[in-house]
Amino acid sequence: MTQKDLQDFLLSEGAVFAGGCRLPNPPIAGQPSLCYAFSFGVKLSDAVLKSIDSGPSYAYFQHYRTANALLDSLAFRLAQLLEKEGYSAFPVAASQSQGKANPYGGVYPHKTAAVLSGLGFVGKSGLFLSKDYGSKVRLATVLTDMPLTPDSPVIDNGCGDCKACVSACPAGAIYGTLPTTDGERNFDAEKCSKYMKEHFQDVGRGSVCGICIKVCPKNKLK
């Protein structure tokens, strides 16, 4: 199967975009051959995002979990297809932490893989913005040793002078700066998480918010 075959599989099963890239450095210790990544995403519902007000809605929390479950299923199935073709594959969960050592990050940043695959850019909010759907997406990644190349070049940041997310963030966690090339965060993940846990315990035990997604003008909610 070719890269296009596998990307077409993802698109046929619910992803709205998919791509691939070579990573600058292999992310898995002891597995240097896993230096390529499939990146793909699913779109969140406009109507559900509009239900977010001064905090997350119950509908958004459930929708968020359902999107993650779909992504994890797609990543698992893609990994199976890759292994059937004789490649190694390491699915990275849609939402995953690495314990106390890295409580706000997974095995490899989905946003980095998506940007390197030419699928979009990381905005001032720290969110990934896809070319067609803005930040109203969720991402997953599968690391592999199958050689992959981007279908499009890396996209320039498209935020311009907009700071809608900065003004709307109730935690004050968004700096309003563009992300750096060395991967330094342009928002305070700890402050974001702390605010959610303190103020949104009744919705998913403070695990989601979504305000920065709702207010982003790139999303053009219908």
Please tell me what each predicted stretch does.
Residues M1-N68, S73:
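Non-catalytic, usually N-terminal nucleic-acid engagement modules in DNA/RNA processing proteins
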Residues P26, A67, L71-K222:
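Catalytic cores of enzyme domains
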